[in-house]
């Protein structure tokens, strides 16, 4: 690794590359800016103002832009009374290397095996390593969309994880054993559930202490309030805070060591404001519904920030394409080799690039310097690409392809330059490493060999095609036919039925793969309409009651292997007094199937339920078309 004390002096190559006289960036800057800094140059005049930002000459304005934005940064920090104390803490410094983060649904079958009834963290992590190089942290998600189905609040849902808190604690330890940090969620919007009469910061901190978590993700927060940090400090536990949104107040940067954010979409990649203000702050880009993540990865690589590799989105599977997975693997490999460079306070975006729509950022130290390069063109670029100041004895490496470079050197002394030739795939990436004379870089040869092995297969040779995951309904064995309705059942007559339903998922789009797939459909979709010729069937007149379920248990001795919360409303193995005819609750799907099999019945399909309730006249509610 590179020595830790990198930045005690000014960067040795903070010089202007010889060129034509640079333009002055004189756009007035307000005290506050949005998530991205303004681009380095003047916006083109009408009619190109909205469609022609690619015309901005970033090379010509870059030096002046960096100068003006450095002044703005200095003054802005003075105005807010900025303190970097939290970034100097050794016990939370890992956040500065938390490059690949994911949100994981606890229902994910790679995380938990319901048959074996055990957490399978190794299986989950091994799959991610195989597909895109693995993760540095995970957000264990046990709340939405299930919250609200009963009175349990966000903390109580964690207590009800398989194995309870001890089971969750072991899962956390299993992640940490593999070098993966663990975040827990907190929801400001959880207001209609059981009130524990304690503030959210106290509830989630106590939970983090109990299971040994490393951080807290603030769902829907644009900055986790300072009360969370003060509560954690009071409990003597170091927690990293990570709001879902970009910080609404720059002052919150002082204790929110991480944040999620979105990428800019301009051809010229924008600089992320928070990263510019505090280079040690880890931004993890999030774009959960993306099917092509190239723009995300280029913005990420240019800014030296991280990514949220979220695929299981509320139970809807949005898997990385092969190309996206391989791209993230290569970026993360470079990041994990040179984490100290990516937090350099002397970061310089918009290094001089000689190819149109190719952009680079410089992350320097006294020992070595990394340039991250992105090709925004939809075609391959090859030739002289990057012009940088040169120091005598410096060696250059193509860190993306794993080979040493022989740049074209010109000038001497302070005017010396190196012109570097690169070959960049269309919409591709590059990385240049400059190592000063006799500078120590541990196992550089091994790293270069690893990158060469990865680069042996170009990114464009991996499939970029996104495909929805197919869904198949598990067949249910038919029950024994009955000519007339058994006791307690009614006959639903045969008929033609327009089955119409629309998904309630609040996010996402109307793509293939979104929501649910019925047996007659070729792919999952949000909206469904299908005419079904229904056969007659018998249907229970009333929901299964507590008394009915008690008869089943008495007759069979049924008891589930996992009995947590099983028949939670019962007392001493029986329904409460007066509850015999109430619908039975706190039974699982497996419990319901076991009861139905004992009763000689089966659970209804969704379209059978809807047909029984809606009838043949298409009414919206069982009683008619108007809400009563």
Residue ranges and their predicted role:
Residues 388-404:
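Solvent-exposed beta-hairpin/edge-strand motifs
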Residues 57-58, 64-66, 236-385, 390:
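Active-site-proximal substrate-binding groove within the catalytic cores of carbohydrate-active enzymes
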Residues 2-84:
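N-terminal accessory beta-strand-rich subdomains and adjacent acidic, glycine-rich linkers
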Residues 52-118, 141-145, 480-493:
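An acidic-aromatic substrate-binding cleft motif
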Residues 438-607, 614-621:
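Extended beta-strand/loop cores of jelly-roll/beta-sandwich
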Residues 148-297, 301, 314-323:
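Aromatic- and carboxylate-enriched substrate-binding clefts and catalytic-loop regions
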